[in-house]
Amino acid sequence: GNVVPDTKERNHLISLYSNTMQSVALSHGIPFIDLYNASQKLYQQDKDTSYTINGIHLTAEGYVKLAPSILPDSLFAPLPKNALLEKIRHEVLEKNDTFFDWYRTVNSFYIHGDRRNPYGTVNFPLERKKLLQMTSVRDHRIWKVARGEKIPAEVDDSSTVKIPSTIPGKRGGTSPALTPAQEKAKFEITEGYQVELFASEEEFPELRNPVSINFDGAGRLWVATMPSYPHALPGIKANDKILILEDTDQDGKADKRTIFAKNLYLPLGFEFGKNGIYVSQEPNLVFLEDTDGDSKADKETILLHGFGSEDCHHAIHNFVWGPGGGLYMQESVFHNTQVETIYGPRRSKDNAIYRFDPRTHRLEIASRLPPGGNPWGYAINQWGEHLYVGRHNNASLINQPESGNVANANYGNRDNRNCGQEFISSRHWPDELQGKVFSNQYKNFQGVLIHDWTEKGTTYDHKRLGKVFEAQNKACIPVDLQLGPEGALYVADWYNPVLGHMQYSLRDERRDSSKGRIWRVTWKDRPLDKPAKIVGATVEELLDLLKAYEDRNRYRARRALWNLSDETLQPALNRWVSSLDPANLNYPLHLM
């Protein structure tokens, strides 16, 4: 269960502040709203309902209940409690959403910051002007509704500045778009490997610009799509999605699609939690919950607010659970983060690795090293060592985030872009590959590489061992990868003729948000692994999976165990730990 700080001492301090503020306000004849006592009264009336997320930030129901205290009739004219008020509220929310896109915009470093020139001056002036005009249109609708006037059901933005839907592209470097079959035909595949298409936009039109993938305990592949990248255009609602793809007949191809969540905006990363997923929704960390078990999100909770949004592809992402139960996530250059937590503000500039504990809502900055951009790829090995991408040349680094002990991967060409990393821990792959690392690269090489990190004293030696496959097509942009429950490697292919962020116009006619592929890589002459039973497994079966050879089996079993209640887990865990043999060489690993 959730464990937040003891509220008794804190409430005593708040009451002292509240009473003093009230006394000073009354002595000066200043109106005072006593939210402390109002909230205490509410909580005592209904102790079974959570009116806050974490003890200080209200839920939607909490705002509804406390609204009369926040806006008392003694200070404000009473609001009508009828259908008119709901109509006004609808229009206000529409206006607020539009204005939010203007004042808390993503990619603000390209609008107000150092990259305003040369990119922002081309991309944003008309877009920003149109957003303000759209806000004004919606503001006028609010006043008309308040006066009792009839308004059209649809907002009319015809009076706002006209912007061509697309513009001709001038910058070079793009590639022609190919069908999945045409793309695969150009792959150069190293002997021994086999690459097949698992899913594409042809079978699943919603599979557009996949950016992050993750397998759940049932063996289903979850995919975050991001066709709104790099920036939603004024008047076009973002509709990024979280998809669930299934291979129900076990033929190596997806044949079923479920939309877990839609109407998202730039879900750069996600990770599983209890009955839902944690999702990046800059400037927020959001939890999307499935409360009725139908594999569709029906509840959204903003857990943390205030993460940077200055560059949309550097926002919080690379979500991965550490062995200690913390959710790690990475943020990059240009960003300024100020998150209010129940333990005080957490601030960071330009780069950070965060660790979030969902039980206590504690957010910690685990590391500010290394500074740099494009940190796409994060993996933790069986001993809890962190391998992540960082620095402008996208060298991989391995250490504990809290330490300064960092090893760099040295390339002949420093302008590489790694994107996604996965330790090889599956008996489906040859013995000589065990412990090595699969890694995507999408610039100066499009495909999957193999790296070797070998311990050397207190740091690591790095070798690039070769390639799995090379696309020979710059529109192939591998952005994430993960070993599936059967040991196959799944690769998310963003697939876009335009490889770049703001270097190309937002409305460049060559941008293509309609495509996306998932590739499945196997070794020809070795059997696949037998998928571990996670869903429906007993506590004892899950605990035994902590001894499994495969990192991913242990990872997924650990998540299932964390979701159990203490009453269910603790007795079985105590018995299991007692049964371990301290003489076993893997004894420390089993305890992790």
Stretches found by the model and what they are:
Residues 22-27, 44, 68-76, 247, ...:
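Sec-exported extracytoplasmic/periplasmic mature domains
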Residues 2-35:
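Substrate-gating cap/lid alpha-helix
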Residues 535-544, 566-580:
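Amphipathic alpha-helical scaffolding segments comprising HEAT/armadillo-like alpha-solenoid repeats
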Residues 27, 50-176:
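Conserved catalytic region of serine esterases and O-acyltransferases that act on ester linkages
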Residues 549-550, 580-584:
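Short inter-helical turns and helix N-cap capping residues of alpha-solenoid HEAT/ARM repeat scaffolds
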